[in-house]
Amino acid sequence: MGGFTSIWHWVIVLLVIVLLFGAKKIPELAKGLGSGIKNFKKAVKDDEEEAKNEPKTLDAQVTQAKVHESSEIKNKQEG
């Protein structure tokens, strides 16, 4: 009644998993799952780092565009 709190629930779940996949496949499945989780965490970390670096790039582009625009205005005023 309290969910999967009893040890017998876990024993039955483990037994069903062994029956479905076989004892030899379980380590391969666990390895694949672990590898997938590792790759997912790496991708999330890479995206966070990219997001941190992105505003700096945009700020530099905006500043460069403003400098270019102001130099064009000066050239028009002088010419």
Curated annotation (Swiss-Prot):
UniProt biased composition (Basic and acidic residues): 66-79
The protein's name in its UniProt record: Sec-independent protein translocase protein TatA
Subcellular location: Cell inner membrane
Main location: membrane
Classification lineage: Bacteria, Pseudomonadati, Campylobacterota, Epsilonproteobacteria, Campylobacterales
Family: Belongs to the TatA/E family.
Gene symbol of the encoding locus: tatA
Record-annotated membrane-spanning stretches: 1-21
Pfam families, alphabetized: TatA_B_E
Physiological role: Part of the twin-arginine translocation (Tat) system that transports large folded proteins containing a characteristic twin-arginine motif in their signal peptide across membranes. TatA could form the protein-conducting channel of the Tat system.
